[in-house]
UniProtKB/Swiss-Prot annotation:
InterPro entries: KH_dom-like_a/b, RbfA, RbfA_dom_sf, Ribosome-bd_factorA_CS. Pfam families: RBFA. Monomer. Binds 30S ribosomal subunits, but not 50S ribosomal subunits or 70S ribosomes. Transmembrane segments: none annotated. One of its GO terms (biological process) is maturation of SSU-rRNA. Belongs to the RbfA family. It comes from Prochlorococcus marinus (strain MIT 9211). This is Ribosome-binding factor A. One of several proteins that assist in the late maturation steps of the functional core of the 30S ribosomal subunit. Associates with free 30S ribosomal subunits (but not with 30S subunits that are part of 70S ribosomes or polysomes). Required for efficient processing of 16S rRNA. May interact with the 5'-terminal helix region of 16S rRNA.
Amino acid sequence: MAHGRRVEKVSALIRKEMSQLLLDGIRDERVASSMVTITEVEVSGDLQHCKIFVSIFGQDPKREEAFSGLQAASGFLRGELGRRLQMRRAPEIVFKLDKGMEKGSSVLDLLGKLEEERKNKDEISEGMNF
């Protein structure tokens, strides 16, 4: 059980430090000019591999640019994490694009449209009742 807690703790620490690095550690303009949010961090049981799920706000070309900037900076970020967390060996970092927020936004848009259509339908049916 202690092993699972350690993985969770390291995951939380990586998320915290990586968020800080995204704010002030990356000088790559592709990443610095984008709004990048870490949505989840998954660390393997042996602490050697780390998947970082990110959400990037913006249009598709800009999003892809920022994501490729993150991937290019993964070696630098791995080294910084190792120094900041004082780990003997920093985990290998893999970035994954999380489209959950995007999907949630589109669902909310659809629900809004349905509500509007329902109101219009109710207004029309009320107008027909004399």
